[in-house]
Amino acid sequence: MANSIIVIGAQWGDEGKGKIIDLLTRQSTAVVRFQGGHNAGHTLVIEGDETILHLIPSGIFNDVDCVIANGVVLHLPTLFDEITLLQKKGVSIDHKLHISTLCPLIFPSHIALDNAKEKALGSKAIGTTGRGIGPAYEDKVARRAIHLSDMFDAERFLEQLNRLMEFHNFLLVNYYKAKPLDVRAVGDEWLSYTDKVKPYVKDTALFLDSINNSNANILFEGAQGTMLDIDHGTYPYVTSSNTVAGAASTGTGPVSYTHSEPTRRYAISYAVFCLKKKNHSRFYEVS
């Protein structure tokens, strides 16, 4: 039976998860990001060379499949900045990186709204990273989000983008007294990524299901920490996604099992909670 492990922070992030993930990747077939966006950075130091990744799973330096699943909000410029960085370091990306068709996209208007809101709050600001994560998740919940798969029908994509940015610009101009964004410029820029991102896009839920059913190990890479969870963290000073272990299920898709013996099998066999104390990272395993 495969052992699938989830690594999450037990505090507010920066607990040293990257080190643990790098260690556990060596016994895994796939490493999966299931929530958050490019707001959290995982630092890896390999042979003295430091690399900070915000979107691509830390396992990309190893010979494993790396999955950005549906629970992640995706900023395409950051994704391709990371791909370029890794390629310059001689890291193979092709056939290893897999991105869900269902990832909601982050646009410049999400970032503009994020920063405008923080500015308007003044001394009561939450302290977001200003990268559009919150507004992108707001659109997802409000059923306004544009998904990665929508980009492959240019006409439909531009119609969706026009509606979305009309709403965003209305808020920017009329509520936050900020400048509107150019819809056409954003549309042209994002459509320029279509051919580049297409080789990486797939139904990651089915892909992970096939890996799981082959009894291979899956490593779920949590971002941020438990105390930043939108439901269970120090609300309202939290992030906009669920960061606890349970988020791995909704953030990746259902995992089915086919077995003849009357046994119980779980998607996640172990949870590793990372804790930072006095400049040292510790981790605890729960099965």
Give the positions of each predicted feature.
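Non-transmembrane, aqueous-exposed alpha-helical and coiled segments at domain scale
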Residues: 1-256, 260
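Hydrophobic alpha-helical segments, chiefly the membrane-spanning helices
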Residues: 269-287
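Conserved small/polar residues in nucleotide/adenosyl-binding loops
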Residues: 257-268, 277-278
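Short, flexible active-site-adjacent loop segments at beta-strand->alpha-helix junctions, enriched
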Residues: 103, 265, 272
